[in-house]
Regions:
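PLD/PLD-like phosphodiesterase catalytic module centered on the HKD motif
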Residues: 84-86, 91-234
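Active-site cores of enzymes that catalyze phosphoryl transfer or operate on phosphate-rich substrates
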Residues: 16, 21, 27-76
Length: 234
């Protein structure tokens, strides 16, 4: 769950799901070593008979799969939301499809909230993130900046029944260029813990409004669109 200050979410995975993450790592390892081999020798002989509630589906997103798994998953969760979708992301550099999905969700009365850092790690990425605030706010999306520190979490929760916890940022590097992974949680007890953590984070964060955009427009609007031209490379 969320680590205060850094603003990250950690998840412990046991059982068959943990083996899936091992296979993801070995596939990437073998790719860079230009080698092939069986992974079964790395599989531990442990009892996986302890059945918990709900389902956990590990997934990976990489430039080798031929499909943008992370981006597609995020868009699908936003499109499927009926009541709410809450998103934590260090960077908010979104393509037209993702921007449209967020705006349409808010316009159909889905409670859409996004938390980004108040303290950046990269100033130019920070400006690009903020340059997207106004368009989303005008559509009804609620945006927060995490004031205690940098938020590193990449977490989505939808309608209290589906959540994604992983390494995929909302930017082109994560969606198209990086080896990333995550876990999709469905009807698990842990989803309630994630939601409670998110509401605690909302309380610690500053909610951004149109007035904030107006007060900062000269700082953000001039450089943001210029940097957005470079977003396919970032």
């Amino acid at each position: 769950l969320l680590s205060r200050g850094l603003g990250d979410v950690y998840k412990r995975q046991e059982g068959e799901g943990a083996w899936s993450f091992t296979v993801m790592f070995l596939q990437m390892w073998n790719y860079f070593r230009y080698s092939e081999g069986s992974y079964l020798s790395y599989k531990p002989e442990v009892d996986f008979s302890n059945i918990e509630d709900g389902y956990v589906q590990p997934y990976k997103s990489s430039p080798l799969t031929g499909e943008n798994v992370g981006e597609n998953l995020y868009i699908q969760m936003i499109n499927d939301a009926q009541e709410y979708i809450y998103i934590f992301t260090p960077y908010l550099i979104v393509c037209n499809e993702l921007m449209t999905a967020l705006k349409l969700a808010a316009k159909r009365d889905v409670d859409v909230r996004i938390v980004t850092p108040a303290i950046p790690d990269k100033k130019y990425i920070y400006k690009m993130t903020q340059s997207n605030y106004k368009e989303l706010l005008l559509a009804g999306v609620r945006i927060y900046q995490y004031t205690p520190g940098f938020i590193h979490s990449k977490t989505l929760i939808m309608d209290g029944r589906l959540a994604s916890v992983g390494s995929i940022n909302m930017d082109n590097r994560s969606f198209y260029h990086h080896f990333e992974c995550g876990a999709l949680l469905y009807d698990c007890k842990a989803i309630a813990d994630v939601k409670n953590d998110m509401f605690a984070t909302f309380e610690e964060s500053e909610e951004i409004d149109i007035l904030w955009c107006r007060n900062n427009i000269s700082k953000v609007s001039l450089i943001g669109p210029l940097l957005n031209l470079l977003s396919p490379l970032l």
